[in-house]
A protein has these predicted regions:
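Active-site catalytic loop in hydrolytic enzyme cores
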Residues: 107, 123-220, 243, 282-288
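CN hydrolase (nitrilase-like) catalytic-core segments centered on the catalytic cysteine
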Residues: 97-117, 170, 180-268
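Cys-nucleophile CN-hydrolase/nitrilase-fold catalytic domain and related Cys-dependent amidase chemistry
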Residues: 53, 58-138, 202-227
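C-terminal beta-strand edge segments of enzyme domains
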Residues: 163, 233-317
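Bacterial N-terminal signal peptides
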Residues: 7-19
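Short beta->alpha transition motifs characteristic of CBS
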Residues: 83, 90, 133, 144-151, ...
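Short beta-strand segments enriched in small/hydrophobic residues
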Residues: 35-50
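Boundary at the C-terminal end of the N-terminal hydrophobic targeting segment
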Residues: 20-24
Length: 317
């Protein structure tokens, strides 16, 4: 193993052995060395958004509360779940309306003590982003990822990749068209990520030529990096419009071990055995070949989200 691989491996070990807030505090109080989690229970929520922001919030928060009772630690919702993937609605929803809706979702996470990854437009300084808000069990937005590779004309492209902790597990986020770009997963994995949350509102089932590539691409991202992918997609509508569902959880060997239908508002849950997410295929690209230095420079551009650094989300209606 060369020096570059050692450096990245050290980063990954740090992320896998650094626990979440409660684990860390409890371990210090007991005088016991913290242990990394061995599993993570996740849910990919195939949520059907409508044009009514309040109804979407009600549906999302209802799922969060229900899934918490089932022991789920992180609930993942589709791209633009908060508003629906409707360009006119996205463009006319104000920053204040989005912030209020997000606060209500954050309240639900805080009340039941789980994480949520929610697709939402986000306005900042006159710019409009296609984003994912990662909310922790205290109701804090610990990361806000903006879609980088765009299929739409309305958003501003994002400018960063990130690695964040969910119950101490290093994770990253991509959105829909991002899946076509292998580096958007490979770089966060080299920076420590073991689970990728993938939010989408993919092409409708009438666009048959795209369905096979959609499946192949995201499975490739899992196996070529030896990590889990938790994919929340919007369902197809009865008139065959909208997306095409099939939300799924993909194992580090690329096989799908949980998937739902094309049309239903359904949820796929899974207990991820984190020992399987070794990132070995990603790390091999640092061990040999002409791109070692290139990957090393790319890893430096990944934002590492430190526990406790984000500002809290206001938790009142």
């Amino acid at each position: 193993m060369n020096g570059t691989r050692l450096a990245v491996a050290a980063t990954i070990v740090l992320w896998l052995t650094t626990p979440s807030h409660a684990q860390d505090a409890g371990s210090r109080a007991a005088g016991v060395a913290p242990q990394p989690p061995k599993s993570l229970k996740v849910a990919a929520v195939q949520f059907r958004s409508c044009r009514d922001l309040d109804k979407n919030v009600a549906g999302i928060t209802s799922q969060i509360r229900r899934l918490a009772k089932e022991g789920v630690r992180v609930a993942v919702f589709p791209e633009c779940a908060l508003t629906g993937y409707f360009e006119d609605v996205v463009k006319t929803t104000t920053a204040e309306q989005l912030a209020d809706a997000e606060r209500r979702v954050a309240n639900a996470c805080r009340e039941v003590g789980i994480y949520a990854v929610v697709g939402t437009p986000y306005r900042d300084g006159g710019k409009l982003y296609n984003s994912a808000a990662v909310i922790d069990p205290s109701g804090r937005v610990i990361e806000r990822y903006h879609k980088i590779q765009l299929a739409e004309s309305w958003p501003t492209p994002g400018d960063h990749l990130s690695v964040l902790r969910v119950d101490g597990v290093p994770c990253s986020v991509i959105i829909c068209h991002d899946e076509r770009y292998p580096e958007l997963v490979r770089l966060p994995v080299l920076a420590g990520a073991r689970v990728i949350f993938y939010l989408s509102h993919e092409s409708g089932i009438r666009q048959e030529s795209k369905l096979g590539p959609y499946r192949a691409q995201i499975q490739a991202r899992a196996v070529e990096n030896t990590v889990y992918v938790v994919h929340a997609n919007a369902p197809a509508n009865d008139d065959l419009s909208g997306s095409h569902g099939q939300s799924r959880v993909i194992a580090p060997d690329g096989n799908i071990f949980g998937e739902v239908s094309m049309f239903g508002e359904e949820v796929v849950t899974a207990d991820l055995d984190l020992r399987r997410a070794t990132a070995v295929n990603a790390l091999n690209s640092l061990a040999q070949g002409p791109l070692t230095d290139w990957w090393k420079e790319g890893v430096k551009r990944v934002r590492i989200v430190e526990v406790g650094s984000p500002a809290p989300v206001e938790s009142r209606r």
